[in-house]
Amino acid sequence: MEYAYLTDPGKVREHNEDSVIIVKNHNNEYLLAVADGMGGHRGGEIASSIAISHIGKSFRELGKLGKKEDAILWIKNVVSEANVQIYKYTEENPESSGMGTTIVLSVLTKEYLLFGNIGDSSGYVYKDKQIHKITNDHTLVNLLLKSGEITEEEAKDHPRKNVLMKALGATTNVEMDIFDVETDVEGIFLCSDGLTNMLEDEQIAKVLNEETTAEEKMNKLIVKANNRGGTDNISVAFLKKDGELSDN
């Protein structure tokens, strides 16, 4: 397995409100996660950091995920715990009112591959030199698109593109969408919208196809997004499979 993750403030924002992680546990299982925070007074930075720290720590401490049903339950529970932590922080620090974060994650074991998301950070599988989006964005624009009120072209530059219908930490309860995916993929790729607002899927895939290391690929994606304006924080995480997962 080769993997790398990277985050960058971009060219416009003063602070980086994204957080990103890849963790391997004792059972040779992998967690990838990206969070894109929002809110004033560094609130977004705190929200995404709480989410990623809690989820990463819990995964590290977990001996193994177990069966697929157990893993789905773990994902739902750990995300719910992170949600409560962010919500409580807001209650104790009123100046951070309105803070929250997106979260997209993926877990890979020998037996299964799962994705989960809240918000508009994206999860993809990498296969046959292409990336295929697994997650669905919880945005107003995506709702309008699915209901047929706007076209895909209109969605790209819609003035309310950043309006989220769901975020971690915004309410006491939040439900994560879980996706059960076939394991016969060549890689997993997660990113915040700071990348997808700058680059098309084909441009991302082109970089992933290059004969370079995972770290070099992640660096190049960030450089490309910044060259196109870097209007937001940019976070990327990529795991390239090299055959089957072993038990050690």
What would you call each of these model-derived segments?
Residues 1-248:
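PP2C/PPM-type serine/threonine phosphatase catalytic domain
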